[in-house]
Amino acid sequence: MESRFTLTDNEIGAKFGRRFGNTSLVIIQSALPKTTQELVSLRVSQVNGCGWCVDIHTKELAGAGEPAVRINLVAAWRESTVFTPAEQAALALAEEGTRIADANPGVSDATWAQVREHYDDDQLAALVCLVAQMNAANRLGVILHQRGGAYELGMFAS
C-alpha cells in the first residue's frame, strides 16, 4: 500500500502542516517530561494502528537512550513493572482519551485523579493537548496510508 496523497504538496495541506507543527512546539517545550511525551505518543499511535507514528516514536525513544524493555512493554504497560506511577497515569489518560468511543464516560474520574496526583496544571495541559494532537496526527497518517519503517531519527527536529 502506497501513500495516497502528500499533504504538504498541497497549499492547504502545507499551511495546515506548518500550523500543526507549531502546536507541537508548545507541547515539546512544556514541562511535561520528554520521555513521558514519547511514551504517550507511542501508546496513542499503537491504539490507533498508525505505523508511521509508531515508527517515529519508537525510534525517538530508542535514540534518547530509553531501554528496549520499556519501549517494547508500552503496548502492555498495565502488565509490566517498568513504568513509574506518573507514567502509568499518563498512559492511562492516553488510552482512555484515545478510546473515547469505546468507553463511557471517556476518561474516568479515577484516571483523572491519578493524573492530577502526578502532574501540575501546565504539565496536565500539555498532556491533554498531546493526546488530542497525537490522535489527530494518527488519523492523518492512517487516512493517507503513511507507512512505518522509513523514519530516520531526528527527521522532524524543531
Predicted segments — roles?
Residues 1-158:
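Hydrophobic alpha-helical segments
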